[in-house]
């Protein structure tokens, strides 16, 4: 499906190495302090940071809270570079991170973007001119600006444990942004940002399924969680320059997810030859390419072999990767998604069938 002809063939040793990057290996590369209790995944240290964040959000604590500093400290025992940032930008330090949303270990379509926005808050706003509490009150002065959606997320439940869970799932969770916004819309909310900006064609093609009152939210989610959202840079900024981005432990985790999922496909296709191949759609492809290449070099120990690195990346590009037609195109559609040429309606429909009514 949608593959281009390629003369590159992967060595069996490379395929085996991709398969070795299994769930257990991926969990060790998770920078958020993942702890497994049976089959349940927990993030106790991240939850402690979120609880601290909520105290600052309520204005109950003096001092300065910084997401970037908290995340760098959380991941201090993991090899790699810390998250870089642009000085004391309030967006970097106060804005709630968004990184991984969706069933990232089993997804079929991965929407890979650069970072989450700020809803109009300029990167020039500094922490020495604005407290975290004041930052989250920006929507009270201008309803069209600032983190209104995060305030709604925090106020959604009364219990602290529920608030912590909701915030954590915004940072890393198994429910996709398409699912979250679609379920909210089914329950009377306005259409969400990602559905309006990125998923109009998907919604249009699946209206009868998504908005059928006889279909449960859970059944909708089983389909729509096949779409996974990965941000390269977990912190927020209004503009890419305001991020001060460099490859770091968190961006590499996103790249390792991609390598893991491709390895899982190679492992599964041996016994299930007709399974759908995962596809990865990239915006800011230049930055993503550099990060994936860094992950390949790290994992395969290809530091001194650029030819092997390029050969593997080219194979992944030809067989698994898609781009948007321009830097400004972000909508996941038959017009905007390209594999050297636009993929067209038939191929787009085949790729996104996993998001549709399974009864059809």
Regions inferred by a protein language model and the residue ranges of each:
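C-terminal capping/extension of enzyme domains
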Residues: 2-51, 57, 243-259, 286-360
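Non-catalytic accessory regions outside enzyme or core folds
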Residues: 2-98, 106, 121-148, 301-303, ...
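Adenosine ribonucleotide-centric catalytic and binding domains
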Residues: 84-216, 304-310
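Hydrophobic/aromatic beta-strand patches that form the interior of the parallel beta-sheet core
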Residues: 110-112, 228-230, 281, 322
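Short, well-ordered beta-to-alpha junction loops that form the rim of enzyme active sites
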Residues: 113-116, 232, 282-288
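Hydrophobic/aromatic-lined pockets within catalytic cores
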Residues: 117, 199, 203-207, 237, ...
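Short catalytic/ligand-binding loop motif for oxyanion handling, primarily in non-cytosolic enzymes
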Residues: 118-123, 236-241, 288-294
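Hydrophobic, aromatic-enriched interface-forming segments
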Residues: 183-273, 277-279
């Amino acid at each position: 499906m949608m593959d281009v002809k390629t003369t590159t063939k992967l060595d069996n040793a490379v395929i085996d190495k991709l398969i070795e990057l299994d769930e257990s290996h991926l969990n060790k590369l998770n920078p958020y302090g993942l702890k497994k209790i049976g089959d349940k995944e927990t993030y106790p240290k991240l939850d402690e940071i979120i609880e601290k964040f909520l105290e600052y959000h309520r204005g109950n604590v003096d001092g300065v809270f910084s997401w970037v500093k908290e995340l760098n400290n959380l991941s201090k025992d993991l090899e790699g570079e810390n998250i870089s940032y642009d000085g004391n930008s309030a967006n970097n330090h106060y804005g709630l991170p968004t990184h991984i949303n969706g069933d990232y270990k089993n997804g079929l379509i991965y929407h890979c973007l650069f970072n989450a926005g700020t809803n109009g808050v300029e990167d020039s706003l500094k922490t020495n001119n604005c407290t975290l509490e004041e930052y989250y009150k920006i929507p009270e002065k201008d309803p069209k600006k600032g983190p209104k959606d995060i305030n709604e997320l925090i106020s959604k439940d009364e219990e602290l444990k529920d608030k912590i869970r909701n915030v954590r799932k915004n940072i890393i969770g198994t429910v996709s942004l398409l699912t979250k916004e679609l379920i909210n819309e089914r329950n009377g909310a306005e259409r969400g940002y990602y559905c309006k900006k990125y998923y109009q064609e998907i919604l249009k093609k699946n209206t009868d399924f998504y908005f059928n009152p006889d279909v449960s939210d859970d059944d909708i989610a089983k389909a729509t969680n096949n779409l996974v959202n990965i941000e390269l840079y977990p912190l927020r900024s209004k503009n890419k320059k305001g991020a001060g981005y460099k490859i770091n432990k968190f961006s590499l985790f996103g790249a390792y997810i991609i390598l893991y999922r491709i390895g899982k496909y190679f492992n599964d296709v041996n016994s299930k030859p007709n399974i759908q191949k995962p596809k990865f759609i990239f915006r800011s492809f230049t930055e993503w390419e550099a990060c994936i290449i860094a992950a390949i070099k790290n994992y395969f120990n290809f530091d001194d072999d650029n030819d092997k690195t390029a050969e593997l990346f080219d194979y992944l590009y030809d067989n698994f990767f898609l781009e948007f037609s321009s830097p400004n195109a972000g909508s996941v559609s038959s017009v905007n998604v390209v594999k050297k040429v636009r993929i067209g309606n038939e191929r787009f429909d085949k790729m996104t069938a996993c998001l549709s009514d399974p009864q059809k």
